[in-house]
Structures are given as structure tokens and as C-alpha cells.
Amino acid sequence: MKKILAEIAYDGSIYHGFQIQPTKPTVQGEIEKALMKINKKKVKIHSSGRTDKGVHAKKQIITFDIKINIQLNNLKKALNAILLKNSIKILKLRYVKNSFHPRFSAQKRKYSYCILNSDNYYPWEGYQAHYVNKKLSISNLNQMAKTLIGKHDFTTFSCIKDKSKSKFRHIYFAKFKKRGKYIIFEIIGSSFLWKMVRSIIGTMLDIEIKNESISTFETILKSKNRNLARTTAPANALFLERVYYE
């Protein structure tokens, strides 16, 4: 039995996160149900990470094993015939070594956050974006983002329920970019704590909106005090962009 890697994309709006939950709709639950229809037996999938409720993915990585003999192209078509109506799409399928694990083999992960920073927009343009009516300074936001680069203790931006033994994470890239009426924040790190990216975004935006000193963000980061973090930014504007492997 060969291990199959799948690149998948999904709209997380209707799901209670990626990880399976017995009584709530999840991305993992829908994919495993689709695989069971095709395989006729239960199939367990493994992912590169668990996105929270409402968070989207442009290229999430999962792996699974199935016993039936089917060409990958036909398997992709069969899965998409079931999953597309549920806002999940299989982008690619390929075989990988049995030693490969989508989470533990990953080197880096990239997320993006979409901020709608204009009054000139259609109602549906805010569907997967966080609307901020005050004009934001890209320069100020990027000065705060620079302090994230390197290895830091991110206790301040962790969730109380996060069970990670270490709160240290390595951030390789963090930058805001203007794209028309949107401001896009991109961040690449070794991995991320539960709700860490949204907590970082929410804090930076709050400091900028209130015209506080840029140095406030670094002070909050170094404090290792969860109570100093500001409002967590909404989930609907966060995207898992890609996962990096060797």
C-alpha cells in the first residue's frame, strides 16, 4: 500500500477548523468521508497542521493510504466530484515515501492575512478580508513586523489552551504589502502556535489604529504576558498559503 500526498485548498468559512470533531463539520471529516466512499473502508488522513475555525487554505498538505487500485488522476476526479460542493478541492496527488509525514517533515509554513483598507468596495469583497476603515501606514506596520524576525518566545501571542511545550518559534519573513484596496500581511515561520498569527495581526493593527508608539509592539512581544496582547484578528481573512519541505 503506497502513501499518497495531496495538495488541497479549501474555504474554511463553513467549517469548525481542520481537525475532525465528532458533532461538527470539519475539513478532515469531509475528506475522510469522501475517501471512505471511494475506498469502501475508513481512511485516516494526516495533515501539515490544523487550521482554526474559519481559516482558509490555498495549499494544505495531507497524506493517506488506500488499498484500492486506482490511477491518481481518476482518484483526484472522484474526490473532487464529492468535495467541490463542500468548498474543498484536491489540487494535486502524488506518491511519497512511507517515511514522509506532512507535519514532521515540514520545514516552514507560510500564512497570509488580508486587510480591506478602503471605503470603495463591494459587499462581497469583505467576505475573506478584515475591514479596517482607518487608513493604515504600511511603513509603521512593517517596522513592527521587523521585530518578529528571528527566534522568539511567543508566549504573549499564544492561546491559553495551546499545549505546545515550547513557545519559541523562528520567523523567517514578515511583511505588509499594498495590493490595490487591500493590505496583505505575509509571514513565514518554522511553525505557529494556536491563534498566534491572528493575535500578532490584531495587536499590530490596534497599535496602528490608536496611533501608539511603534515600539509598543516590541515591548508587548518581549513581555511574555498574554494579557498585553490586543484583540485577536478575525479568522475569515487568514490563509495557509503553503508548506515548505526539503
Swiss-Prot record:
Keywords, A to Z, come to: Isomerase, tRNA processing
UniProt enzyme class: isomerase
Q: Which organism is it from?
A: Borreliella burgdorferi (strain ATCC 35210 / DSM 4680 / CIP 102532 / B31) (Borrelia burgdorferi)
Biological process (GO), any one: tRNA pseudouridine synthesis
Query: Highest taxon of the source?
Result: Bacteria
Which catalysed reactions does the entry list for this protein? uridine(38/39/40) in tRNA = pseudouridine(38/39/40) in tRNA
Q: Which CDD domains match?
A: PseudoU_synth_EcTruA
The record lists substrate as bound by 111
Q: Which HAMAP family match?
A: TruA
Q: What is its EC number?
A: 5.4.99.12
Its quaternary organisation is:
Homodimer.
Q: What is this protein called?
A: tRNA pseudouridine synthase A
Give the matching Pfam families: PseudoU_synth_1 (PF01416)
Give the protein's biological function: Formation of pseudouridine at positions 38, 39 and 40 in the anticodon stem and loop of transfer RNAs.
Q: Which gene encodes it?
A: truA
Query: Is this entry keyworded tRNA processing?
Result: yes
Q: Name one GO molecular function term.
A: RNA binding
UniProt lists the family membership as follows: Belongs to the tRNA pseudouridine synthase TruA family.
UniProt-annotated catalytic positions? 52
